[in-house]
């Protein structure tokens, strides 16, 4: 999924495929969840973004970074439009996480080692660390949080 192919060599079909999964998917999920949430008195929308959409695009993958940037702004707009409906919308921004996708993107040992030089904690994050953020945002502990950004990246965006 993550290639180092220059923008001018990309196809519209590649671009659209990534946008369909990452930004259109979030739009459709949100669009269809809002009426049910409103009818039940509120809810919490949690979008999984990426540090690539936070302004730290180390992927060199323009479609992916742009799609995650779209999710970032969409989450904020949703928050402002639906706060009065008691619907909260927040986004989580994972850094490199120990998943099949990250390992596939960095299949060369040098690539992973190089990426980790830009993570102060020096390791991949764990899925359970992202899950903890999701649980927090879904809980009443975050009841006054909407339009927020929870960055879970081992310090990568602080560099």
Map each language-model feature to its residues:
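Substrate-binding pocket helix/loop in short-chain dehydrogenase/reductase
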Residues: 6-7, 11-16, 111, 115
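Active-site loop-to-helix junction immediately N-terminal to the catalytic Tyr of the SDR YXXXK motif
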Residues: 10, 56-65, 77
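Active-site helix of classical SDR
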Residues: 30, 67, 75
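Alpha-helical segment proximal to the catalytic Tyr-Lys
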Residues: 35, 80-81, 143
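Residue(s) in the substrate-gating loop at a strand-loop-helix junction
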Residues: 50
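Short C-terminal tail/terminal secondary-structure segment
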Residues: 55, 134-135, 146-159
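Short, small/polar-rich loop/turn modules that mediate ligand/substrate recognition or access, typified
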Residues: 83-88, 145-147
């Amino acid at each position: 999924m993550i290639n180092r192919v220059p923008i001018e060599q990309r196809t519209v079909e590649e671009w659209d495929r990534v946008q369909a999964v990452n930004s259109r998917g979030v739009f459709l999920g949100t669009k269809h969840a809002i009426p049910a949430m409103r009818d039940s008195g509120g809810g919490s929308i949690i979008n999984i973004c990426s540090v690539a959409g936070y302004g730290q695009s180390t992927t060199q993958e323009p479609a992916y970074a742009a799609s995650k940037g779209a999710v970032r702004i969409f989450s904020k707009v949703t928050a402002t439009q639906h706060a009065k409906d008691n619907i909260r919308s927040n986004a989580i921004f994972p850094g490199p996480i120990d998943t099949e996708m990250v390992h596939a993107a960095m299949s060369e040992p040098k690539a992973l080692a190089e990426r980790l030089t830009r993570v102060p904690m020096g390791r991949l994050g764990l899925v359970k660390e992202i899950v903890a953020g999701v649980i927090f945002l879904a809980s009443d502990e975050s009841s006054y949080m909407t339009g927020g950004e929870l960055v879970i990246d081992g310090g990568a965006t602080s560099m």
